[in-house]
Amino acid sequence: MAIVDTAIDGINYFLSLSLTQQITILVVFPFIYNIAWQLLYSLRKDRVPMVFYWIPWFGSAASYGMQPYEFFEKCRLKYGDVFSFMLLGKVMTVYLGPKGHEFIYNAKLSDVSAEEAYTHLTTPVFGKGVIYDCPNSRLMEQKKFAKFALTTDSFKTYVPKIREEVLNYFVNDVSFKTKERDHGVASVMKTQPEITIFTASRCLFGDEMRKSFDRSFAQLYADLDKGFTPINFVFPNLPLPHYWRRDAAQRKISAHYMKEIKRRRESGDIDPKRDLIDSLLVNSTYKDGVKMTDQEIANLLIGVLMGGQHTSASTSAWFLLHLAEQPQLQDDLYEELTNLLKEKGGDLNDLTYEDLQKLPLVNNTIKETLRMHMPLHSIFRKVMNPLRVPNTKYVIPKGHYVLVSAGYAHTSDRWFEHPEHFNPRRWESDDTKASAVSFNSEDTVDYGFGKISKGVSSPYLPFGGGRHRCIGEQFAYVQLGTILTTYIYNFKWRLNGDKVPDVDYQSMVTLPLEPAEIVWEKRDTCMV
């Protein structure tokens, strides 16, 4: 009763104060409590050092959100590779560098969870029952189902389809209209997301489905994409316009896929070797005998296309911008491409999947772009059990989060010489190649979707690692390589401005700040 009486006395005293005094206490007390909590937290020797912050709950969100890599480096210089910070009410523990990659990417499933970290963000976009809205074992099998469309035989058929889509885009899109003009200005943040959607849908979903994809459909995917922002990560559902557009886009795209799935089932028009949709209609039964529902298949199709769209749209936008700043590199790429085609006695229409493997500068340009601009600058996992940081006294509590940033290592001079320079030829160096190889890269592990390298202790991991490693790396290189060679064969281009745009970190994907434009002109070999 003494505690209750004391509490009542405290409330009565507070109510007896003037309004100004009450407001002052309500405003000041959270700050005092916040500072006191941080001081007490810092006394615990088993806790990772925390970056000091003034504003309760908000924490270091501004510094991290505006320039994450600069924030990480500043913290590293003060605390070392392991530190924590407050991000909108969540304690994030960061472990930088290859040891951090190993610690987080290869953490035990029982200790960390991507599903718990991301489901509230991804489920409104992809839909229920897939990706992070299901047990991890289900996700591993879903990745295996999707890999049926990512075989070498499939890639061989994708190259001419991608090339045709890009050439048609050059002819028909207002940014180019190459039948009507020889030069113009194109915004890469308009052209590349659309080209990515059109080429990926043609390859993965088939010719008939591609015909139903127009610019309005690309806009629906853009509306979905806007659901991947920091505010969505914290507040999955708010009564705001971009949330409404996200939900409307999800319903329309899902209904479109469901209509096609129903048509194929009713007509019996199913060939598992034709495209991903047919493959999933035939090969989507889990090991325990449960079959994916048609709605789950439709949702998985959204996830597959969205996952690839992030990487390829941002990467192709960035390599166009960097190449615009280096005309000599464009000429070197053109020479590499045309020399190969001369040996074949043909033109760009004769370029094959096998030929793409014989273009080292093309592939190194993609590789260098992914180094400088890893699409996702941070990857999160929620800690499910107390997690000890190797070779330290630190223990990360259950309920906190761990954060890995391969993109930080990509852009650090600790691992790459002059990391701020776009230099595809760095990958011709044996030293650079060696630095990007994991210590145990020859070891493999199968999480349920095929064998992958177990090693993640590398400073270069553009497609992630561990059980959540992206399965679309080879498809990305096919898609990006075909897009790049089609641009190089048909155009020269330069920046429509003084320099390559800065990175927009306000979204969760590292896109160029707009305006991001190139001025293009036809080459003599232009085909359209």
From Swiss-Prot:
It comes from the Eukaryota. CDD domains: CYP51-like (cd11042). Its cofactor is heme. Signal peptide: none annotated. InterPro entries: CYP450_sterol_14alpha_dmase, Cyt_P450, Cyt_P450_CS, Cyt_P450_E_grp-IV, Cyt_P450_sf. It is an enzyme of class 1 (oxidoreductase). It is found in: Membrane. GO terms for biological process: ergosterol biosynthetic process. Heme binds at residue 470. Keywords: Heme, Iron, Lipid biosynthesis, Lipid metabolism, Membrane, Metal-binding, Monooxygenase, Oxidoreductase, Steroid biosynthesis, Steroid metabolism, Sterol biosynthesis, Sterol metabolism. Pathway: Steroid biosynthesis; zymosterol biosynthesis; zymosterol from lanosterol: step 1/6. It catalyses: a 14alpha-methyl steroid + 3 reduced [NADPH--hemoprotein reductase] + 3 O2 = a Delta(14) steroid + formate + 3 oxidized [NADPH--hemoprotein reductase] + 4 H2O + 4 H(+); a 14alpha-methyl steroid + reduced [NADPH--hemoprotein reductase] + O2 = a 14alpha-hydroxymethyl steroid + oxidized [NADPH--hemoprotein reductase] + H2O + H(+); a 14alpha-hydroxymethyl steroid + reduced [NADPH--hemoprotein reductase] + O2 = a 14alpha-formyl steroid + oxidized [NADPH--hemoprotein reductase] + 2 H2O + H(+); a 14alpha-formyl steroid + reduced [NADPH--hemoprotein reductase] + O2 = a Delta(14) steroid + formate + oxidized [NADPH--hemoprotein reductase] + H2O + 2 H(+). Its EC number is 1.14.14.154. Disulfide bonds: none annotated. GO terms for cellular component: cortical endoplasmic reticulum; membrane; perinuclear endoplasmic reticulum. One of its GO terms (molecular function) is iron ion binding. Transmembrane segments: none annotated. It holds the Pfam family p450. PROSITE patterns: CYTOCHROME_P450. Belongs to the cytochrome P450 family. Sterol 14alpha-demethylase that plays a critical role in the third module of ergosterol biosynthesis pathway, being ergosterol the major sterol component in fungal membranes that participates in a variety of functions. The third module or late pathway involves the ergosterol synthesis itself through consecutive reactions that mainly occur in the endoplasmic reticulum (ER) membrane. In filamentous fungi, during the initial step of this module, lanosterol (lanosta-8,24-dien-3beta-ol) can be metabolized to eburicol. This is Lanosterol 14-alpha demethylase. It comes from Candida tropicalis (Yeast). The lineage of its organism: Eukaryota, Fungi, Dikarya, Ascomycota, Saccharomycotina.
